[in-house]
Amino acid sequence: MKPFKVVAPFEPTGDQPQAIERLSEGVRRGAREQILLGATGTGKTFTIAKVIEQVQKPTLVLAHNKILAAQLCSEFQQFFPENAVEYFVSYYDYYQPEAYIPTTDTYIEKDALINDEIDKLRHSATMALFERRDVIIVASVSCIYGLGSPEDYRDLAVSLRVGNQVDRDYILRRLVDIQYERNDHNFVRNKFRVRGDVVEIFPAGATDRAIRCEWWGDEIERISEFDPLTGEITGTMTHVAIYPASHYVVADEKREQALRSIEEELEERLKELRAQGKLLEAQRLEQRTRNDLEMIREIGFCSGIENYSRHLTGRKPGEPPYTLLDFFPDDWLLVIDESHVTIPQVAAMYNGDRSRKETLIEYGFRLPSAADNRPLKFAEFEERINQVIYVSATPGPYELERVPPSLVVEQIVRPTGLLDPEVEVRPTKGQIDDLYAEIRARVKKNQRVLVTTLTKRMAEDLTEYLKELGVKVRYMHSDVETIERMQIVRDLRLGVFDVLVGINLLREGLDIPEVSLVAILDADKEGFLRAERSLIQTIGRAARNAEGKVIMYADRITQSMQKAINETNRRRAIQEAYNRKHGIVPKTIVKPVRDVIQAVKPVAEAGPANILDTPPHEIPKVVAKLRKEMMQAAKDLDFERAAEIRDIIFELEKKKRGA
């Protein structure tokens, strides 16, 4: 087995060495739950990478959205170039779940656009878990949604070994059984082609490698790996396993058993509906279910086959589904990034899914067993955890209640020597004039300012007022799309404008080194946006600049404000003491400004100045070019860039549907 090995141009510094040692020791001693309480910009990802290197366990890193998961995956791939770092998120570029609205008698068909590249990465992730131990999978909450049985996925893999006596046609039938298609002309993922005694297979989890298997009579004579584009042989092997093209594949005997089980449930449910006088619902359910059964019998699957997953995997009613977590070996490590956001998100998934399914079941669109195609309940998620490290600058009440203080590991000192910003409270009387004076002082130094308000109206009025005073200012509200949001952040960094006004700026993940002032208006209005955790996160936006400062405008100091100020001052004191002891002078982080639309420049140059202004009739052509760029970015392991292009494609397609 290849061990985890971190490759980095720097060594752990500041608080990192003690954090790495304490967390690693906790894992080795069998501590089930630990917290890495790391301030913004202290290098938490590097610390976790070093912990993985120390404990040598297969690891799942859970992030609360696709973009963050892509960024983390990219970082871990740089730290672990010799190990398997995989990416597992929802493969839907666009997803409209099946639903029924009784008040208007409206049935909404499931509509989805599957990203083939992400589907490939999901297969690559599950295959890696069966073939090696040095695996890190970075995932979104998609990992708690139903997946097929890991036993079926592993047992149905087609094993090819040099010297084995096996009929070539038998192997071809096995490939069809696991949902590979024969195509001698269009050789792409999930396809195979046959040329005499040579069978070539393009595995489900591969991008640029295919398998060539050569027979001599009934004996496998040679197995080689080759580049499907050039045909160049890149290596030979004695054994290879071809894993199924779908995570929902099942053996023939299991499928027959599942069909009988679905028939039985259908008959039972039809009796119930007819007894209740719901004849329309009964007719609808019978027609839809029998169509699905026919499809499964004929071709092995149907649209919406996941709704029958309980029968296909042989589970009892109410039993939790198989998920990515079941593909991990027993001795695994879970890292929950930004746990104060991710934990509540995991907890909320089940209830939202359940209410939609209940309506579909009640009105005869689905069998009751469809409710068992679901995400894990939070208690089920907890049961599956072996060992976990919660990572956050502001851990939530759930983590803090469960983890004893001795297992809360602080990482306060930044490798750059940067301090948490000074926090000052000023009265609200004359606050706008005071803020204007502060903005002017920052603009003279070529620095940027973030202003956070409580209401949309206040943000809009403040933006207009500052514009009238000649300030280059923009307002970022919740309606701003992902791509435009990225462009706004980029323009702020480049100095196209100097002040960004918003309501919930902390959710944007705005780590902008040029920001030296964060102004919090109405800081004394208690609520979600002015709670201790939110205030600490907002204060952290000024922690990347050596001159970082936070001004809270308030007429009184609330408990949340006091706690946030005390915690910031505590961290700042620790950081100052460390800097004095080691003679470190804080320096603002130097971070290159990346062109967020760089990914689409070749397309944009040939079209409108803003790609989102593309006329509807030209959108299909532009989307086709963008998809090629996205595939190339993913191939280059630049998932952040690929995700940006994906968002542009999504918004263009939404615009076309609207037109």
From Swiss-Prot:
Domain UVR: residue ranges? 620-655
Give any single GO term for biological process: SOS response
User: Locate the Helicase ATP-binding domain: which residues?
Assistant: 25-414
Which superkingdom is the protein from? Answer: Bacteria
The entry's localization annotation reads: Cytoplasm
Which residues does the annotation say bind ATP? G38, A39, T40, G41, T42, G43, K44, T45
A Pfam family the protein falls into: UvrB_inter
Q: Does the keyword Glycosyltransferase apply?
A: no
CDD domains xref list: DEXHc_UvrB, SF2_C_UvrB
For the Helicase C-terminal domain, which residue ranges apply?
A: 431-597
What name does the UniProt record give this protein? UvrABC system protein B
Q: Which GO terms describe its cellular component?
A: cytoplasm; excinuclease repair complex
Q: Which PROSITE patterns does this chain map to?
A: HELICASE_ATP_BIND_1 (PS51192), HELICASE_CTER (PS51194), UVR (PS50151)
The UniProt annotation puts motif Beta-hairpin at 91-114
Gene giving rise to this polypeptide: uvrB
User: What's the subunit arrangement here?
Assistant: Forms a heterotetramer with UvrA during the search for lesions. Interacts with UvrC in an incision complex.
In UniProt terms, what function does this protein have? The UvrABC repair system catalyzes the recognition and processing of DNA lesions. A damage recognition complex composed of 2 UvrA and 2 UvrB subunits scans DNA for abnormalities. Upon binding of the UvrA(2)B(2) complex to a putative damaged site, the DNA wraps around one UvrB monomer. DNA wrap is dependent on ATP binding by UvrB and probably causes local melting of the DNA helix, facilitating insertion of UvrB beta-hairpin between the DNA strands. Then UvrB probes one DNA strand for the presence of a lesion.
Q: Which organism is the protein's source?
A: Symbiobacterium thermophilum (strain DSM 24528 / JCM 14929 / IAM 14863 / T)
Q: Name one GO molecular function term.
A: excinuclease ABC activity
Sorted alphabetically, the keyword list is: ATP-binding, Cytoplasm, DNA damage, DNA excision, DNA repair, Excision nuclease, Nucleotide-binding, SOS response
